Amino acid sequence: MRKIISLNALFFLFLGSILSINTSAQALSNDDIKMQMANDWQRAKAYTNEYLNTMPADKYSFKAVDSLRSFAMQMLHLATANVFLMATATDQSPLPWTSFDLEKRKSAQSADSVKYYVNASYDYCLDAVKNSDPAKWKEKKTIFGFETTKYALMQKTFEHQTHHRGQTTVYIRLNNIKPPQEKLF
């Protein structure tokens, strides 16, 4: 009998400690989420700049395969999509140079031009996140035939730039250069 009481007492102590942890945990506020998103965009900008600075300027025209985009074109696509997707998510006007033919313009494909457009796109996304209204994050948007929330589209914008930066890792490696180390924090 004494063992049963002791086991019951231990069980209820354990259960009580779990319940107190759960009730003392606080949910993230919208401001916390917005701050984390801004921090992630700042980190992504710094990480992408490491990629831009790792690839030699004379290799920006390099293509992993003839049918694919060059390194410069990948990064210009990233820049255009950053602005277009984030503008759609936040109902802001896109930057004046935002055009899906930007990546095909020879004048935009130099290392200096690519760095300009990419950095401008990250600054645009950072400002859009910082100035976004969390009360509107649940509003629906339709893009490319898909309906999603503004918040989800902001997240998909981040996912998209991660995907295209990641693709350029192969371009750097094929030039016998070590790509930047992963930057999770």
Regions found by a protein language model. Name each.
Residues 27-32, 95-107:
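Acidic/histidine-rich, surface-exposed loop or edge segments in extracytoplasmic proteins
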Residues 47, 51-52, 86, 124, ...:
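Well-ordered alpha-helical scaffold segments within catalytic/enzyme domains
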Residues 38-42, 49, 59-102, 142-185:
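Short, contiguous alpha-helical
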Residues 42, 46, 80, 116-119, ...:
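A broad detector of short, well-ordered amphipathic alpha-helices
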Residues 106-140, 152-160:
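Acidic/histidine-rich alpha-helical segments that form the ligand environment
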Residues 1-30:
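Bacterial Sec-dependent N-terminal signal peptides
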Residues 27-46:
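Short N-terminal segments immediately surrounding and downstream of signal-peptide cleavage
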